[in-house]
Regions:
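Substrate-binding/active-site clefts of carbohydrate-active enzymes
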Residues: 1-4, 8-138, 169
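Short, solvent-exposed polar/charged micro-motifs at secondary-structure junctions
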Residues: 16, 186-189, 245-248
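Histidine-centered beta-alpha loop that forms part of the nucleotide-sugar donor binding/catalytic region
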Residues: 23, 181, 239
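General alpha-helical segment detector with a strong preference for membrane-spanning helices
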Residues: 25, 29, 183, 243-246
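Active-site-proximal helices and loops of the catalytic beta/alpha 8
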Residues: 26, 35-45, 50-68, 134-140, ...
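Glycine- and acidic
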Residues: 117-121, 144-149, 243-247
């Protein structure tokens, strides 16, 4: 931690800011903390694995079913009982190769498999909300300037509104950048408190088509106009770790 804080200090001394990647939707399937503070529980450590869904559980469980990886690796020796839902919302015990089978979905109080589908259970507050807020506050206290929030749209906006307001109350300088790919959700997540959102589906995809000669540059104007009311919250980019180099 001393090395980390020294890095932050050097970065700030150079006139730069430090942004940390925050992945709130999922964890690795073999996740476990290796340096957790005294008195802090791992995600899932106190779960009642006999329940598919509970607001007090951090994960979703396929009760009574072991994880079956036959579609991914024919002779896998990996054992998980009961199976946990994957990060891309696969709620059965036999994920496909196209699923995020190496990840586990975090439970923010939405029951995806009830009779009505996606019912919200936000009161009492889900345990995951409190644990993830603690993580944000911990790193904000170390001098982080911003969080880049991975797959933010897969986490309910209600959580973001709660968590970001709490972080900004104590650390008003901290900014939040959300990875939201669905343009119909842009305004919801901005209202929830995000300072900036990726404009991947809009501006990035448009610029890519222009560079490839698939459309005229006038298309850029149309993209701008589609988000004119929220353009100050849109983060435009040419490259990131998920996309090809723009020159290629």
């Amino acid at each position: 931690m001393q090395e980390w804080q020294a890095l932050i200090a050097r970065t700030h001394a150079a006139g730069l800011k430090v942004m940390m990647d925050f992945v709130p939707n999922h964890v690795a399937r073999e996740y476990q903390s290796i340096a957790k503070p005294t008195g802090i529980s791992d995600l899932g450590e106190k779960d009642d694995v006999s329940k598919h869904f509970s607001v007090q559980n951090n994960f979703y469980y396929c009760w009574g079913q072991p994880l079956n990886l036959e579609n991914i690796a024919k002779h896998s020796s990996y054992i998980e009982q009961p199976a946990k839902a994957t990060g891309n919302d696969c709620f059965h015990a036999t994920p496909q190769k196209s699923d995020w089978y190496e990840t586990i979905k975090l439970n923010y109080g939405i029951d995806y498999c009830d009779a009505g589908g996606r019912s919200e259970h936000f009161s009492p507050m889900p345990r995951t909300w409190m644990m993830m807020l603690d993580i944000l506050l911990f790193w904000a206290s170390k001098g982080i300037d911003a969080f880049r929030c991975d797959m933010a749209e897969m986490v309910p906006a209600a959580f973001w509104q709660y968590a970001m307001s709490e972080v900004k109350r104590l650390f008003p300088h901290v900014s939040f950048i959300g990875e939201v790919y669905n343009p119909s959700l842009y305004r919801l997540y901005i209202r929830s408190g995000f300072d900036y959102l990726y404009d991947k589906i809009g501006m990035y995809d448009c610029l890519r088509r222009v560079v490839r000669g698939e459309c005229d540059a006038t298309a850029i104007t149309q993209v701008w106009q589609a988000t004119d009311d929220i353009h100050t919250h849109m983060l435009y980019f040419l490259e990131n770790h998920d996309e090809q180099r723009i020159a290629s």
